[in-house]
Structures are given as structure tokens and as C-alpha cells.
Amino acid sequence: MTEFDLSTREGRWKHFGSVDPIEGTKPTTKNEMTDLQSTHKDFLFEIEEVGIKNLVYPVLVDQYQTAGTFSFSTSLTKDEKGINMSRIIESVEKHYDNGIELEFNTLYQVLRTLQTNMKQNAAGVDVSGKWFFDRYSPTTNIKAVGNADVTYGLAIDGDKVTRKELTIEATVTTLCPCSKEISEYSAHNQRGVVTVKTYINKDQDIVDDYKNKILDAMEANASSILYPILKRPDEKRVTERAYENPRFVEDLIRLIAADLVEFDWLDGFDIECRNEESIHQHDAFAKLKYRK
């Protein structure tokens, strides 16, 4: 049995089974290597979307940097075998400046670069990240950082936008109207998870504070907003406000819809509210879809 010098890293590697590279016969330079993806012949079908998923990259949401999880895709004609996936990352890097800004205009430019680099007509992106924002306690007005989850969706064909979506998921407090009605005192309440997917008008300019307007519709219609910091006067106010504004999941999604339907820059929306019931072993939920 061969003895290896275990005092060296290379010796320890070989002791655990590593071997020396062989002298191969295949090309080692890019220009000499076969590019299978670029093979051209009849491959029977066009592909609507092909690309990468779960690409984690730094993003900028307003003034905060966070991690974004991307899915990128392009179309593929039937006479091409595949796409060069490394060009997707190269396209992203051309727009990277301490993070990719999560705004529709920036994502549009990334997709235009992707179209050019991939030599395809259609391109799309979906990216999810954490949105951080300043939140003040309701009575003492103490500032802290709140958060919600956002997902941007954008697709283009040529220079035309074919899909423009924003999804926000936020948590709220809901107090049970039935519990309040039948009880001599108190009422059960719980955390509710509200998800709103909006379909944004592709031909109309969107308002500057669109995220805040959607989030306000989600939170203001609940029994109470959630806060990072609550002192005793704040806790008293939050508790009393929830009691003053009882909400079933059905109530909440209808009230949110009543606000969203007034936004002329939306073509429609999907709403779901899921209550993590505090007195049951199950959750309660409601869903609503609306198209103008």
C-alpha cells in the first residue's frame, strides 16, 4: 500500500482517495470545444420558457439591501437545441450596482439585455425578496423596522410588456366577530397572513408609492396592524383597536378588495387571507379573485 505524507494537504487528499488528473484528449479551450446548445436543426417544438430558478442575488428594495430569489427565462425557437444559461448571469451582472433594484423599470432593462444576449424574442423574470420599511408605534411614535414579502413578475415579447405583477404578503391581527358577540368579555384573536397578487396595467404609468398603497389596503382593513415595538400605551391601543374592528377572513378580503378596485392602475387582483386560529387546531382561509 502506498504511503502518503500526511503532514501535507495533498498527501492527506490522496490518503482519502484523491488521484492525479489524467492527460485527456478532448479540447481544453473554449474555441475548440463543441457548443451543443448552439446546434441548429429541426428540434420539433418551440419552447415558451427555459431558464434558471432559485438564483439568489443581492437586491435593493427602496433604501435597504436584501437577498432576492430570481427565476429567469427566455423563449427558444424550434431550430435551436438549447440556451447558453451562463449568459443569464452575465445579463444580470450588467445591471448590478450593490444589488439589483427591485423596480419594474430596472427589471425591464435586465430583460432587454437578456433578450439581446440570448438572441430570443421573449424573456421573463420573477423575483421575491423581503421589503423593509420604517414603522412607528401607534401611540408613543417609536420608530423601528417592519417588513413584508414582495414578489415582482415581469415578462416581455420584443419591446412590449406582456405580464406585470406584484405580490405582497403581510401579517396582521384579526379578532373574531363571533367570539366578541357571544362572550361576556374578551374575544379570541390571532395572526392573519394576507397575500395580495396584483395585475398591473401594462400601458399605464404606475403611481410612485404603489407598494405602500397596496400594503395600506391590506393592513388598515384588518383588526390591527402588527408593530415591531409596542410600549404599554401602544399595546393598550392595539388591543382596543382590534376589539373595535372585529374581522372574519371573509370580511377582511372583501374590505381589501373594496380598496384595491379603486386603483385605476390595476387590471385585477387575487386575495387570500389565512388565519392561524388561536382556539382551533386548524387555520381558516378565504380567497377572492377580481378582474376589471
Swiss-Prot record:
Reaction(s) catalysed (UniProt annotation): GTP + H2O = 7,8-dihydroneopterin 3'-triphosphate + formate + H(+)
Sorted UniProt keywords: Hydrolase
Residues the UniProt record annotates as site (May be catalytically important): 176
E.C. number: 3.5.4.16
Recorded GO MF terms: GTP cyclohydrolase activity; GTP cyclohydrolase I activity
InterPro entries reported in the protein's UniProt record: GTP_cyclohydrolase_FolE2, GTP_cyclohydrolase_FolE2/MptA
Superkingdom of origin organism: Bacteria
One record GO biological process: tetrahydrofolate biosynthetic process
Pathway info: Cofactor biosynthesis; 7,8-dihydroneopterin triphosphate biosynthesis; 7,8-dihydroneopterin triphosphate from GTP: step 1/1
Signal peptide: none
Function: Converts GTP to 7,8-dihydroneopterin triphosphate.
Family, as annotated: Belongs to the GTP cyclohydrolase IV family.
NCBIfam families recorded: PRK13674.1-1
Name recorded for this polypeptide: GTP cyclohydrolase FolE2
Species: Staphylococcus aureus (strain NCTC 8325 / PS 47)
Gene that this polypeptide is encoded by: folE2
